[in-house]
Amino acid sequence: MAACRRCPLCDGRTQTVFGVGNPEARVLIVGEAPGKNEDLQGEPFVGAAGKYLNELLAIAGLSREDVYIANVLKCRPPSNRDPRPEEIQACTPFLREQTRTINPEYIVTLGNFSTKFILKTDVGITRLHGTLQRAGRFKVFPIFHPAAALYDSKKREALENDFATLGELLRGEV
C-alpha cells in the first residue's frame, strides 16, 4: 500500500493514509480522503475535524481505540478537491479489504461523498444522515462530516444528535 502507484495522486502525496484503530472494531468510520495534516502525519482525522470527531465519538460512548477510521481515498487530492472516479476505482480494493478484514457491525459514513460511495446511491447526506441503512450485510449509519460543523454551526446539533443515536444503536436502545 505504501508504494501504491495505481493513480496520479501518488505523485503529490507525502505518504499513504491507510487507516487507524481497532482491527476488531464494531464500528468502521469512513471519511472521504486525507487532508493536508493527514497526509503529513499518515493518520486520518488529525486536524480540527479530527479533534471534533473525538468529541463526537465520546457522545456515542466511544473513543478512537474502539473504532477503526479510514477514508475512501488513501492519498490526498490536490487542494482538497473531490475525488475523481478513476481515483476511487484505484482505491476501492483497499477499502474493500479493510472492510472484509475488520468485519464491522456498523459502517459510519462521514459526509456526502463516502455515504454515496458506500450505499451506491445518488441520495445525499442531507436526506440520509441519522438513518440506519444497509449495504450488503453491513448496517450503515450516514452522518455529516465533522468538518461541516466547523463551517456551518447548524450542522453541529445534527452531528451531535446523530452520534448520540449511534451510541443508542450500539447499546441496543433503538
Model region roles, listed by residue range:
Residues 1-174:
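A polyanion-binding, active-site-adjacent surface
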